[in-house]
């Protein structure tokens, strides 16, 4: 006799724990209904998932990290991020010296000092690599296959107010695609600050403080917590996202706007929120976060559903189950049919709502071409 349950409800999986194999590395995952065992991904399940998703949403990670061993690359990336975070930690409870890049776009001395510290680490280890920093722009040899995308203080406004949603983000691309990433998130609050380190390598998984992480298993928008962000230009793209914010607030458990893209994407990878989207992020905002999500089992695309690269002007990341209804739910139908469990497929998912809104912007002539790609940098995008 088969079991019937609604998509996104994990309780029946607990009754299968005696017959299904669970991971010894990360055996439990937080879900709003409690902690549940995490299924180990068998080769057959992975093949089914990859075949269903690869054509629709190609992977963003680099197929190779190049001649540098992944272990060496990620150690330098983590060292660079931690070095920048030390600068931020020393300043976090002190008065801020604030200037403005725009009417509301802040920059502090801490941004600049953090970036300088990160650059010193990168140059010491790879003096021939190209660097793209939020504050310093393009530095180095454009003939290099490696491009470091550095946000020395993602969420500067939050930092300036002592609001706990900011981070140091370091991602390195190999021929334009993410190869390794580290994000140091600041948690806690005034007088009790702490950090946690997210890291990922292409094909090597995603980790938080050394423990492997994965995206959530929720596949109904109605049961999701979502995150978005808004840029500084109040134009058509901004107004469109306000409408999306309102719409998803009505149909989900809530939509948050925290103001730090790298943090938001790490939270998707950690499985505490299900999706994040935003228009007009820069490469340094996204290079680390998108790799974190993908290596945690999530999906990355543009907001129109197209193939994503870090020089794009829109991004949608999710746990994969919420990205679009057809391909992902077909995977679950196949998988759960093998388990003799009848599966209820939910209503339309994120791209069914975000995609058409983005297409309207394109039809209005809003520019979605690639940007901030260093001139002459060789990228397979």
Residue ranges and their predicted role:
Residues 3-4, 213-381:
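An extended, acidic
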Residues 84, 88, 111, 122, ...:
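Residue-level signal for inorganic ion chemistry
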Residues 142-203, 207:
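DPxDG-like acidic metal-binding loop motif
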Residues 111, 115, 134-135, 151-154, ...:
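Acidic active-site catalytic centers that drive phospho-/nucleotidyl reactions
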Residues 99, 140-142, 161, 190-192, ...:
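Solvent-exposed alpha-helices and their adjacent loops that cap or buttress functional pockets
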Residues 2-153, 355, 359-362, 367, ...:
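N-terminal subdomain of lithium-sensitive/metallo-dependent phosphomonoesterases centered on the IMPase/IPPase/PAP
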């Amino acid at each position: 006799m088969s079991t019937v349950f609604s998509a996104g409800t994990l309780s029946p999986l607990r009754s299968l724990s005696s017959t299904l194999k669970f991971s010894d590395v990360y055996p439990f995952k937080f879900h709003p209904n409690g902690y549940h065992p995490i299924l180990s991904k068998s080769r057959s399940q992975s093949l089914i998932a990859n075949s269903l998703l690869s054509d629709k949403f190609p992977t963003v990670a680099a197929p190779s990290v190049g001649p540098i061993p992944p272990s060496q690359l990620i150690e330098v990336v983590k060292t660079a991020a931690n070095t920048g975070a030390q600068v931020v930690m020393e300043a976090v409870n002190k008065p801020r010296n604030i200037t403005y890049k725009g009417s509301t776009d802040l920059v502090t001395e801490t941004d600049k000092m953090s970036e300088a510290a990160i650059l010193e680490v990168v140059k010491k280890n790879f003096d021939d690599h190209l660097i793209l920093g939020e504050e310093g722009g393009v530095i180095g040899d454009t003939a290099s296959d490696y491009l470091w995308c550095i946000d020395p203080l993602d969420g500067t406004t939050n930092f300036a107010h002592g609001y706990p949603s900011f981070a140091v983000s370091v991602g390195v691309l190999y021929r334009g695609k993410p190869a390794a990433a580290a994000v140091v998130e600041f948690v806690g609050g005034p007088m009790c600050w702490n950090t946690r380190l997210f890291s990922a390598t292409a094909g090597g998984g995603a980790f938080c403080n050394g423990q492997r992480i994965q995206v959530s298993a929720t596949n109904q928008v109605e049961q999701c917590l979502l995150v978005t962000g808004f840029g500084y230009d109040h134009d058509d793209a901004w107004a469109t996202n306000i409408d999306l914010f309102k719409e998803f607030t009505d149909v989900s458990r809530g939509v948050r706007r925290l103001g730090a893209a790298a943090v938001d994407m790490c939270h998707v990878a950690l499985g505490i929120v299900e999706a994040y989207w935003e228009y007009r992020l820069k490469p340094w905002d996204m290079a680390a976060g998108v790799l974190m999500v993908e290596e945690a089992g999530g999906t990355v695309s543009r907001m129109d559903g197209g193939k994503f690269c870090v020089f794009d002007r829109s991004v949608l990341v999710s746990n994969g189950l919420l990205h679009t209804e057809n391909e992902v739910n077909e995977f679950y139908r196949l998988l759960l049919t093998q388990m003799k469990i009848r599966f209820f497929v939910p209503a339309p998912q994120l791209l069914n709502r975000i995609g058409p809104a983005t297409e309207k912007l394109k039809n209005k002539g809003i520019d979605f071409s690639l940007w901030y790609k260093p001139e002459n940098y060789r990228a397979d995008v």
